[in-house]
Every structure is written in C-alpha cells, then in structure tokens.
C-alpha cells in the first residue's frame, strides 16, 4: 500500500527535482521522525529557540546569512509565509499588486487576508514575461483605486520558469513606497538569491520544492524594520508570534531541512551548470519540433514546452492524450502529468548528463515510433 511506484524513476517533475532528500536528511528522518521529537528539549515554548537539535542556530544565524536578510523564520510552506506577510500588512479596502504569473497560492493567500488584488499583465506568447514597466504601470493605476500595502513578484514563476528583472522591479516598488515580497519557491535552494542584493523587503522559499527537505516546510526572510509587525507577539502568550500561530514546522520537516542544508548551501554554487544543462535540453527539444516557451535563452531548470508534434500524435495514438505519460512511464521517466501532450513543463535540476540524454532520446524514440 505504501510502496512508491516511481521511486527509482528519472524524475523531471519541477515540484520534486529540488526536493529530493540527501542521504543525511534520510538518516535524520529516521532519528527524529517521531511526532514532536525535535521538541524534546524545548524550554521556552518557541521552535526557533530550541538548541538541541540546533534549530536556534539554524534559524537565527545560518538561514539569515543564506537568504541575505536580517530576520528569518521557518513556516509550514511558502504559502503560509506569504499569508503571514499579507495578513500582517492588510488594511480595510487595501490592495496587493502581484504578477500575472503568480502561483495560485499567492492569490488565495491575498484573498484570505482580505486584500484586493491587482495583477501585473504578462507579455504575449511565447515569452510570457513580467516587465518592470508593466509593474510600474499597474502600481500607478492601482494607487488611484486605494492604498497598495504590498507587491509580490514570483521569481521564477512555476509555469514558465521565467526570471524577471527583480532588482528593477524592487526599485520600482521602492519609488512608489510599496514593500515588495519575492516568492522564491523555485529559486531558494537551487540558485544564489539574496534579499539584500535584490533590494526587496520580504523573501519566501520552499523547503520541499527546492531545499531537499520533506514537505511541507517554507522559509521566510525580511528586513529588520518589518519584524515587529510581521512577528508581533500574542497579548496573552507573550512568547508566541501570532502570524506563525506560535510554532510552525515541527518534526520531520525542520530536521530534514537542516540536515540537507550544508549540501544545499554548496549546490547553489553550481547553478551555472544547471542553467547550461537546461539550455542544452531545450535546444535538443527544439530540434524535435518541441518549442520551449518563456525566457529564451532560458535561465532556469524549470521549462515549459509547446509540442504540436505530440499533440497531433495524441489524436491518433492508442490511449489518446495519455499516450505520452504511458510511453515515458514504460521508460521509467516520471514527472509530466497524465493527459498532457500539447503543453507541459519539466525540470532537469539535479539530473546527470546521462539522464538528460536518456530523457531526450526517449522523446526522440516516441516521436519516431508514431511518425
């Protein structure tokens, strides 16, 4: 019942390529996987103050340095981090401006926080880019409708893997006196990212998507000036931070995040290799008639493809639109959702050159088989 069929497959699912556990994390999971075992020696009622295991050092020393921020916390996911920021800044009839490529959880978090939402439009096919100019125009127009208490940029987005010019967007937001939150769920842990270098106010990441941790867990960083607002304390339970509901990621999630952290800290230094690998993959897919959409040349391992050749095959092949999933599965390749043939996304993060070639050859074989 609990056997995972795809465990030993080549995994190209963007949700999972950056979240594969390290061997150190697997060992820590066995050691600390029982319930709240990390709370064995909690004396203050605060997760971030636990010193055995060294959670305090991780959250207050290592994580801020890694994120390039003043203050950091762990959350139960990037979406919970986004909501914490939005809810703490929300006012009656206020607005949040976010890019049209945003993850659905960004939009839902804003709705839950009671904020009005203005979307920065993306450019047309095939780039789907978010530009600083469109960001400025949307903020300008939205300010006429009410107070803009926050802006959010997705870096990169989870559809196309586009990396917008986040520094210019941060400058735009600063000029309009609007704090900026960077959703780096597919960036932090894969590539070098620094809140201070970007010039934004908040940054959130995903441990299970991009930091080799069990899910769900997120990270949140901010400038010192926002800590008093976002991390305000309960009136009755003086040690509890309200937006975090006291404590967040307890148990297997925090311990695997910490155990993988030394590896994650090192792997981001090899980001250029991951980009080159993705570009090589995209170029070879183009030779098969499968077009890579979004930034081109691409700057991230998450890629979105338009495959008319596969779509045409699906009209005639046995199994219809599920033929591609089944063909890849038979070759022990996992990650493209069942039923997708015309448009799909994938990630080459962490794959060896041999695995990349194997996946490319699989697509070539499939197309030749049905031609």
Swiss-Prot record:
The keyword Protein biosynthesis applies. It catalyses: O-phospho-L-seryl-tRNA(Cys) + hydrogen sulfide + H(+) = L-cysteinyl-tRNA(Cys) + phosphate. Its EC number is 2.5.1.73. The modification N6-(pyridoxal phosphate)lysine is found at residue 209. HAMAP family: Sep_Cys_tRNA_synth. This is O-phospho-L-seryl-tRNA:Cys-tRNA synthase 1. Keywords: Protein biosynthesis, Pyridoxal phosphate, Transferase. Homodimer. Probably interacts with SepRS. The keyword Flavoprotein does not apply. GO terms for molecular function: Sep-tRNA:Cys-tRNA synthase activity. Its cofactor is pyridoxal 5'-phosphate. Belongs to the SepCysS family. It comes from Archaeoglobus fulgidus (strain ATCC 49558 / DSM 4304 / JCM 9628 / NBRC 100126 / VC-16). Converts O-phospho-L-seryl-tRNA(Cys) (Sep-tRNA(Cys)) to L-cysteinyl-tRNA(Cys) (Cys-tRNA(Cys)). Pyridoxal 5'-phosphate binds at residues 78-79, 183, 206-208. The lineage of its organism: Archaea, Methanobacteriati, Methanobacteriota, Archaeoglobi, Archaeoglobales. One of its GO terms (biological process) is translation.
């Amino acid at each position: 019942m609990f056997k995972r069929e795809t465990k030993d497959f080549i995994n190209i699912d963007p949700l999972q390529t950056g979240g594969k556990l390290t061997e150190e994390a697997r060992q820590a999971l066995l050691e600390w996987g029982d319930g709240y075992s990390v709370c064995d020696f909690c004396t203050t009622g605060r997760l971030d103050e636990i010193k055995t295991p060294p959670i305090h050092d991780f959250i207050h020393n290592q994580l801020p340095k890694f994120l390039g921020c003043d203050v950091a916390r762990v959350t139960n996911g990037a979406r919970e981090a986004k909501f914490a920021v939005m809810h703490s800044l929300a006012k009656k009839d206020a607005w949040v401006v976010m890019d049209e490529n945003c993850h659905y959880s960004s939009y839902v978090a804003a709705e839950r926080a009671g904020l009005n939402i203005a979307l920065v439009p993306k450019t047309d096919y095939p780039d789907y880019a978010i530009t600083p100019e469109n960001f400025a125009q949307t903020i300008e127009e939205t300010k006429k409708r009410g107070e803009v208490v926050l802006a959010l940029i997705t870096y990169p987005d989870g559809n196309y893997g586009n990396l917008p010019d986040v520094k210019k967007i941060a400058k735009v937001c600063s000029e309009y006196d609007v704090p900026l939150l960077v959703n780096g769920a597919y960036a932090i842990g894969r590539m070098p990212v620094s809140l201070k270098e970007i010039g934004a106010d908040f940054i959130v990441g995903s441990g299970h998507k991009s930091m080799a941790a069990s899910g769900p867990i997120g990270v949140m960083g901010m400038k010192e000036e926002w800590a008093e607002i976002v991390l305000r304390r309960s009136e009755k339970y003086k040690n509890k931070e309200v937006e975090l509901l006291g404590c967040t990621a307890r148990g297997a999630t925090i311990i695997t995040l910490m155990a993988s952290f030394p590896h994650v800290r090192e792997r981001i230094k090899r980001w250029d290799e991951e980009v080159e690998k993705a570009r090589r993959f995209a170029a070879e897919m183009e030779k098969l008639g499968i077009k890579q959409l979004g930034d081109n040349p691409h700057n991230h391992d998450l890629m979105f493809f338009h495959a008319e050749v596969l779509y045409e095959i699906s009209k005639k092949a046995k199994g219809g639109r599920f033929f591609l999933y089944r063909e890849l599965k038979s070759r022990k390749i996992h990650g493209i959702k069942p039923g997708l043939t015309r448009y799909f996304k994938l990630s080459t993060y962490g794959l060896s050159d041999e695995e990349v070639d194997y996946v490319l050859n699989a697509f070539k074989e499939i197309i030749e088989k049905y031609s």
